[in-house]
């Protein structure tokens, strides 16, 4: 019994001197584990008489309980001390103002597309979408683009094979629409297009919005009026606009549209023209009965002009300092 008393006293002293939870766990194993000092005392039961065993067993159990209770109290005390220290270290000044959540904003290119869609939507134009991986019929042949036209060159177009490529314009959407729907038609087709070019004013991927109107007696005067109104609406000022004769395989006559910049120079903003009869024939529309006009504009170019951005590549570099200016 004297030995048991000494072991308990030693255990309680070690518990009192322990400075962390790991030390306390080591003490628990050392005294109360399967091979612990107090647990081993039970082995002495075999050498005791029947009269001595009950008293000895009770003493060992009381010793275990005393050490376990002291351990539990010490563990609770250390945990409380650690929590208090942590709370002091992480003290929060509740008088400080809260942090506001920073909300995102629409990308300037998205803003431009939505602005274009809104204007033409009010004129009855429907938004149409199409595949970005296109075949040569919808990207070139149906648009009256000859086999040897420079637009088909490998250095301008991203080909998967000689018959399949990343679309170079959204005109394929117009072709697909005319294949499946009968006139009258009024559509615009915004989307990503791809060309092998990269500099201050070009990127390999950029956005276009093309428009198409096909019906009876559509004429160039209607085209001019709509585009003139669009440009004044988009730039929110009474711009000086001119239509300059040009050439596109898919329209005849064709024109490029310029606006007068604030520096007194003409700036090209889009191309347009009357749909070529060959394009109408390629989709089964009688050019003797129907006529139409088409136009196409680079979204990034319009965005650059509207917001005064000099380098097109800035739109796609994900620099928040730049993008936050358009919130």
From Swiss-Prot:
* PROSITE patterns reported in the protein's UniProt record: AA_TRNA_LIGASE_II (PS50862)
Q: Does the keyword Translocase apply?
A: no
Binding-site list for Mg(2+): 252
> Which coenzyme or cofactor does it need?
Mg(2+)
Spell out the molecular function terms from Gene Ontology. ATP binding; magnesium ion binding; phenylalanine-tRNA ligase activity; tRNA binding
One biological process term in Gene Ontology: phenylalanyl-tRNA aminoacylation
The EC category is ligase
What InterPro entries does the database record attribute to this sequence? Answer: aa-tRNA-synth_II, aa-tRNA-synth_II/BPL/LPL, Phe-tRNA-synth_IIc_asu, Phe-tRNA_ligase_II_N, Phe_tRNA_ligase_alpha1_bac, Phenylalanyl-tRNA_Synthase, tRNA-bd_arm
Quaternary structure (record): Tetramer of two alpha and two beta subunits.
Record-stated family: Belongs to the class-II aminoacyl-tRNA synthetase family. Phe-tRNA synthetase alpha subunit type 1 subfamily.
Database matches in PANTHER family: PHENYLALANINE--TRNA LIGASE, MITOCHONDRIAL, PHENYLALANYL-TRNA SYNTHETASE
Q: What protein am I looking at? A: Phenylalanine--tRNA ligase alpha subunit
What is the protein's species of origin?
A: Shewanella denitrificans (strain OS217 / ATCC BAA-1090 / DSM 15013)
């Amino acid at each position: 019994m004297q030995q048991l008393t000494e072991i308990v006293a030693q255990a309680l002293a070690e518990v009192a001197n322990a400075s962390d939870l790991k030390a306390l766990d080591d003490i628990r194993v050392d005294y109360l584990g399967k091979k612990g000092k107090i647990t081993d005392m039970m082995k002495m039961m075999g050498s005791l008489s029947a009269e001595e065993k009950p008293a000895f067993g009770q003493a060992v159990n009381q010793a275990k309980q005393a050490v376990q209770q002291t351990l539990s109290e010490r563990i609770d005390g250390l945990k409380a001390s650690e929590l208090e220290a942590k709370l002091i270290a992480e003290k929060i000044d509740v008088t400080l103002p809260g942090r506001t959540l920073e909300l995102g904003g629409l990308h300037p290119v998205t803003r431009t597309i939505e602005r274009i869609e809104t204007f033409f939507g009010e004129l009855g134009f429907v938004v149409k979408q199409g595949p970005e991986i296109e075949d040569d019929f919808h990207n070139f042949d149906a648009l009256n683009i000859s086999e040897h036209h420079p637009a088909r060159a490998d250095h301008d177009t991203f080909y998967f094979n000689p018959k399949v490529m990343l679309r170079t314009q959204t005109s394929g959407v117009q072709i697909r629409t005319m294949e499946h729907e009968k006139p009258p038609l009024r559509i615009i087709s915004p989307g990503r297009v791809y060309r092998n070019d990269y500099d201050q004013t070009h990127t390999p991927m950029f956005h276009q919005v093309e428009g198409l109107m096909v019906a009876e007696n559509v004429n160039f005067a209607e085209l001019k009026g709509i585009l003139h109104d669009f440009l004044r609406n988009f730039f929110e000022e009474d711009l000086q606009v001119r239509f300059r004769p040009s050439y596109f395989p898919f329209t005849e006559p064709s024109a490029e549209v310029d606006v007068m910049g604030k520096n007194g120079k003409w700036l090209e903003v889009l191309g347009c023209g009357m749909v070529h009869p060959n394009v109408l024939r390629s989709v089964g529309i009688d050019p003797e009965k129907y006529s139409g006009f088409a136009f196409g504009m680079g979204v990034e170019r319009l965005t650059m002009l509207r917001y005064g951005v000099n380098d097109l590549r800035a739109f796609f570099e994900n620099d928040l300092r730049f993008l936050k200016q358009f919130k």
